[in-house]
Amino acid sequence: MNKNDFKDFQNYLIDKKHFSSNTVNSYERDLRKLFIYLDSNGYDCDDIRSWLTEVCINNYMEYLRDNKYSAATLARTVSTVHVYSEYLFDKNIIKDKPQIDIKITKDAEHDLVIFTRYEIAQILDIDTLTLNDFRDKAIFELSYSIGIKPTECINLEMKDVNLEIGYIKYRKQDSYRTVALNTESIEAIRNYLDALKKHKVPISEESKLFLNHDGEGISRQGYWKIFKKRQKELELTKELNTMNFRNSLAVHLLEDNVPIQDVQEILGLKNIHSLKSYIKSLKKTKAIKRMFSNHPRKAMK
């Protein structure tokens, strides 16, 4: 794959998939890493059918595991391979989209980090003293309302929010999603918008919803720092990041017996299979609660 091929793949990720620049760079790095592996193991990278196979890709995954790559890297590599296959198919470089079952073995899996409802309440309880406080409060409430992902959140524009009816519309890959908001997130966003007006921040319908101190849309790094700052303020032992926050919402919805299909819709998941890890975490939590509720020590009091 030459320089022009990589550029074409990058353009595909941006124009067709609407990925952020950070995601595009990650996919390109993963693909280059794969090609280095293929070349060092005697594969001809230009002969796509020789290596875009279930056996070869799973051998590569085993190589990554042996070299202690994280579960997150393995999962992203799986996504990269699938998206690259779609790209090759869409560009008619291959005639059939390969059906590759990529296996991530259990030793690469890890338990989800789930915040309790009390911890979530603490995180959401932000003293709104400054403009950034109002912004951060709105971001956390929105994240816990619908489990919105970082790229989706930072790309929101003022015109994407309808607080009268109570919904937001945002781009998800090559389509738009319209999602209803809960009362708390509507109130938090409305208070944030009022604070923007009070501070005379110039905004328009096309302005980004969440702004930095320069009045520009916050970056992915800035978004990440908001979560790190809150973790430090509360001295949380669990890592507070966007994924753990989203995972917590999913498990709490399932705990409240929200139908699986509704949880899938709220989180914007493509299929119910994506909920497997959440259901597994919920079962583990319930098992622990049962164990302690029936523990013999309780009868000794």
Task: List each language-model region with its residue ranges.
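Conserved catalytic core of the tyrosine transesterase superfamily
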Residues: 1-301
